C-alpha cells in the first residue's frame, strides 16, 4: 500500500501545494519548449521538489523514458553512459527523455566538469532536472563555486514561508479528513506544519502513523488546561510556564 505522501502526490501542476510562484515560473518556461534544457530546483525537504521534477519530466517524456539518478553515483563513466543513452527515444507518445538527479549538492568535482560541457549541448528531446535541499553558490563540498553549473540551468527556488505553510496545513487537514482522522481545528494543523518545519511529507507520515493524533490530542489538553486556569497565583504562574514550555517544545 502506498504511503499517504505517494497516494496524494499531485499528478498535475494545479495540485502542487504552497508553491504558486514556482509553478508559474515552471509553466512559463515549459510553454517555450520542453527539451534541450536543464533545471535546478532547490528547497527544504518536503516542499515539493520531487513532485515538480516529476511533473516536468511527465510533460515531455513517457514514464519508461524517465530515469532517476543519485548525484553521488554520477561518475564520469556513468555520465558517459547517460550521454550515450540520449540516442534512444520513444517512437510514439511523448518523445522526450528525462533524467532526474537527486541530492545534486552531492555531485563530484569530476562529474561537474563533464556536466558543464554536457549541458551546453543537450539534444532537443532531452531534459535534466537537478534537485537539492541546498541553495546558493557554495553548495559542493569539494567544488566551492556552483555558479558555472547552476547558470546553465533554469533555476527554481521553492518557498517555505507562512503562505506556503498555510497551504500545506489546509492540504494536510483535507487528507486527514479523507482518512477519517478529524476533530482538530485549523490551528492544530498550522502548528503541526511548523513542528515539521514546513515538511508536508513528514506531516503526512505522522498522520499515517498516528503520531499526529497523539500529539494533537496532548496539545489540546494542555491548551484547555491553560485556558481554564483560575486567577493568577504563584503556583499557577509556575504551571503556566510549564504548559507554555510544553507547547513550544511539542
Regions found by a protein language model. Give the residues of each.
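Short, solvent-exposed coil/turn linker segments
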Residues: 11-12, 62, 70, 218
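Pre-Walker A (pre-P-loop) alpha-helix and adjacent loop at the N terminus of AAA/AAA+ ATPase modules
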Residues: 2-44, 84-92
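Walker A/P-loop
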Residues: 28-69
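C-terminal engagement/docking regions of AAA+ P-loop ATPases
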Residues: 225-250
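Initiator methionine at the very start of the polypeptide chain
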Residues: 1-2, 49
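A generic, residue-level signal for flexible/boundary positions that often mark functional hotspots
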Residues: 2, 7-11, 63, 101, ...
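Non-catalytic interfacial helical region
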Residues: 24, 28-29, 67-230
